[in-house]
Structures are given as structure tokens and as C-alpha cells.
């Protein structure tokens, strides 16, 4: 039996144990993981350094290296996230609804774990911690399959998690890592319907599209973040300038702006100043012919650029003559993640909210807030851009299903 199949079978067995664990037992395990991460920070960073060095040798971009890199503060941030997760209400066992039928049957809809969650993701070692702890909190066994670029970091983190779980009532195999990073292991994970209840891809568009296209296992799609901001002709200048920091504050994340859509009338007044401000921050602009006419240093955008999640300081710029044109462009090229409008015209804002198809829509605010903690709902395992079974930041309830519990006293159907 190969690694993937063996770990799938083990995860199915473990899932039946985890459903019996209390909230207190799960929280004790999370606390142990947080403590062990701090205790073994030096070991994790030593292994992460190997990934960074290999990445540099392979010519990884700065944005990819940033996603791959761990440091003491990022590990502290991970542990703080775990502590916040401990404080969140456990959804498992929650009664979603209850009613009584005329025949005396009492019916309850109860939250239960999904069972076995598969996570396939790219060069983000922090996802290893996020996925493991969120799954444990919700009583799910998890099989992790990261990328080859982060294999040293992922192996180290999972080893630390195992050492932590050994001190608790939760089985070490509640969290398992597929160490084979070849395409064959990924393809096998795609079709493990007998063992996986759901597969969650987290990464770039190519990875997500591949999983959605090839997996027979149910998929919770965490879409790429080709996010837009539309600056309407009525937009406040300073507000617009401030909100554009959604691109420059941390460009390598999925909720950063990738395309700036400018109303022509606003651009006539403030466009050149905006472009100059962005270039001072090291931004390389790619725009349409109208943008080029305003600033000759802008690179002409290709058709491919409009649909690209750059994950770097390279936004595209599109000039439009109406909100209808802006909405059409966003719905054509957007990834249904997060979209924003900056406007003082409430009628246009309402039209934007009704017409744009995305998980999160913003008025006069940055798209960078599409995040479980920023929404106030706590930890999330990704941002879903699909419409079933959940949309937007996927918090703890997203990793549960429901079942019906019916109590009677001898009723039969006649």
C-alpha cells in the first residue's frame, strides 16, 4: 500500500475517534501545539532556511520567497492564531434548528465534523499550521499535501505537531503530511473518494483549476484573488489614494488589488498624480491605451494581464466611461473573490453591489479585509469563491456538515 492510500485509510479510522472528543480535549491539543511551536522555533526556522535557499537557487520571485519565509514573529503570529482559535465556539454538536411534528416526532439538525479533510496547497508553511489546527478544532482528521518548495518546513511543522499531540488525548495521526510531492501523489489524492470527504485547494489559479477539473472528491474551491477597485468619478481623492494601499500593503496575498479601474473623469483630474504616487512605491503599472496616453512609462497591458493574479507590485489599470463598463470588466475578468467601489454616489454603489458577482464587495474600504479574523469570525481555512457549500472566508462552521437526530416513542409511518 503506497503512502497516500495508507494515510487516507488511517485518516478515516482517526476521524471516527475524533468525533468522540470533547471541546476541552480538542482545545488542550491546540494549546499543546502552540506551546510546542514556540519551544521548537529554532528547529522550524532551520528547516525553513533550507527551503529558502533552494528557492533562491531555483530563481523564485521575491513574492514567492515572502510567502515561503518563516521567522520568529511569524511563528509567534501562528501561535497567537491558535490561542484565538481556542477561544472560538466549537460548532460541533450545535443544534442548528429543532422542531416537533404533529405525530410527536422531535427533530433536531445537528452540526457534525465533515470527517477527513484533504488540503493541497503551495508555498505557504503557515497553511500547515492553520489547516491542522482548524481541522482539529472541528473534529476533522486532515491530510496535508504541500508543495515541494516548502517540504522541509512542512515536515518540520508536522513533526512538531505530532510531538505536541503525543502529550494529549488526540491521536498523532489526526494530522498527516503526504511527503511525496510528485504529481502522482496529488492525482491520487484527487480520487480518494473512499477516504476523503472533501478536498480544499489553496494557492494560485493553476493549482485550483487543476484540482477542480481533475478531482472526483468533493472540492471546496478557494479561488485566486484577481481583485479590482473601481474609482468612480465621485470618489474622494485622498480616500482613493489611501485605499489603493490594498495593493502595496502586502501584494503577495489573495485579497490584494490586482486591477485599478478608473472612471475617465476622475482620471482626468487625479490619474497622473495617482500613477506617480504608485511608482514612488516601486509599482510597475500595466494599462490600456487610455492609461498610456496619460503616462508613457506605463506598460501596455495584454489580454492575459486583465485576468492575472500578479501577487506582486504590478497592478493593471483600466479606464472606463461608466459604471456599467466597470462592472462588465470586473465580471469578465474577476475571480469572484473581493471587489471594491470608491464612490459618493449611493445609487451607483447599490448597482455595483447587485451586479458584481463576488464573495465580498466593498464600498469605500480596502479589499484586504476579506479575512476571517478581520470579519470578526476568527480563524479561516481559506476564502471560498464558489457558491456551494460556503462562500467567502471559511471559518469553523464551513468544516462541518449536519445530520438529523429524530426522537420518538414508537411512531410508524402509515
Swiss-Prot record:
Its EC number is 1.2.1.41. It is found in: Cytoplasm. The keyword Lipid biosynthesis does not apply. One of its GO terms (molecular function) is NADP binding. It is an enzyme of class 1 (oxidoreductase). It catalyses: L-glutamate 5-semialdehyde + phosphate + NADP(+) = L-glutamyl 5-phosphate + NADPH + H(+). It comes from the Bacteria. Keywords: Amino-acid biosynthesis, Cytoplasm, NADP, Oxidoreductase, Proline biosynthesis. CDD domains: ALDH_F18-19_ProA-GPR (cd07079). InterPro entries: Ald_DH/histidinol_DH, Ald_DH_C, Ald_DH_N, Aldehyde_DH_dom, G-glutamylP_reductase_CS, Glu-5-SA_DH, GPR_dom. HAMAP family: ProA (MF_00412). Catalyzes the NADPH-dependent reduction of L-glutamate 5-phosphate into L-glutamate 5-semialdehyde and phosphate. The product spontaneously undergoes cyclization to form 1-pyrroline-5-carboxylate. NCBIfam families: PRK00197.1 (NF001221), proA (TIGR00407). This is Gamma-glutamyl phosphate reductase. It comes from Bacillus anthracis. The lineage of its organism: Bacteria, Bacillati, Bacillota, Bacilli, Bacillales.
Amino acid at each position: 500500500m503506497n503512502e497516500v492510500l495508507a494515510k487516507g485509510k488511517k485518516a478515516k479510522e482517526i476521524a471516527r475517534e475524533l468525533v468522540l472528543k470533547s471541546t476541552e480535549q480538542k482545545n488542550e491539543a491546540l494549546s499543546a501545539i502552540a506551546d510546542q511551536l514556540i519551544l521548537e522555533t529554532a528547529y522550524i526556522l532551520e528547516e525553513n532556511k533550507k527551503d529558502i535557499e533552494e528557492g533562491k537557487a531555483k530563481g523564485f520571485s521575491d513574492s514567492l520567497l515572502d510567502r515561503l519565509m518563516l521567522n520568529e514573529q511569524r511563528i509567534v503570529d501562528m501561535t497567537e492564531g491558535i490561542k484565538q482559535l481556542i477561544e472560538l465556539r466549537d460548532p460541533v454538536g450545535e443544534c442548528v434548528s429543532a422542531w416537533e411534528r404533529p405525530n410527536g416526532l422531535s427533530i433536531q439538525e445537528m452540526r457534525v465534523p465533515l470527517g477527513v479533510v484533504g488540503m493541497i496547497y503551495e508555498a505557504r508553511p503557515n497553511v500547515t499550521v492553520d489547516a491542522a489546527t482548524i481541522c482539529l478544532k472541528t473534529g476533522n482528521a486532515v491530510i496535508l499535501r504541500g508543495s515541494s518548495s516548502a517540504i522541509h518546513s512542512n515536515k518540520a511543522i508536522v513533526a512538531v505537531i505530532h510531538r505536541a499531540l503525543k502529550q494529549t488525548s488526540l491521536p498523532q495521526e489526526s494530522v498527516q503530511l503526504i511527503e511525496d510531492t510528485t504529481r502522482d501523489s496529488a492525482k491520487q489524492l484527487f480520487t480518494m473518494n473512499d477516504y476523503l470527504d472533501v478536498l480544499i485547494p489553496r494557492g494560485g489559479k493553476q493549482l485550483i483549476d487543476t484540482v477542480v477539473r481533475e478531482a472526483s472528491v468533493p472540492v471546496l474551491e478557494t479561488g485566486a484573488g484577481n481583485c479590482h477597485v473601481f474609482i468612480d468619478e465621485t470618489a474622494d481623492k485622498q480616500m482613493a489614494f489611501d485605499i489603493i494601499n490594498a495593493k502595496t500593503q502586502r501584494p503577495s496575498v489573495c485579497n490584494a488589488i490586482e486591477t485599478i479601474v478608473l472612471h475617465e473623469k476622475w482620471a482626468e483630474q487625479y490619474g497622473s498624480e495617482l500613477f506617480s504616487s504608485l511608482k514612488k512605491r516601486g509599482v510597475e503599472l500595466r494599462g490600456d491605451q487610455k492609461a498610456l496616453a496619460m503616462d508613457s512609462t506605463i506598460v501596455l497591458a495584454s489580454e492575459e494581464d486583465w485576468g492575472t493574479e500578479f501577487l506582486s507590485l504590478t497592478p493593471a489599470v483600466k479606464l472606463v466611461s461608466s459604471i456599467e463598463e466597470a462592472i462588465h470588466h470586473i465580471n469578465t475578468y474577476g475571480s469572484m473573490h473581493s471587489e471594491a467601489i470608491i464612490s459618493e454616489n449611493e445609487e451607483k454603489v447599490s448597482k455595483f453591489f447587485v451586479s458584481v458577482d463576488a464573495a465580498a464587495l466593498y464600498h469605500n474600504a480596502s479589499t484586504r479585509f476579506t479575512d476571517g479574523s478581520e470579519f470578526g469570525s476568527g480563524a479561516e481555512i481559506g476564502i471560498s469563491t464558489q457558491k456551494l457549500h460556503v462562500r467567502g472566508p471559511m471559518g469553523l462552521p464551513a468544516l462541518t456538515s449536519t445530520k438529523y437526530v429524530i426522537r420518538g416513542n414508537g411512531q410508524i409511518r402509515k
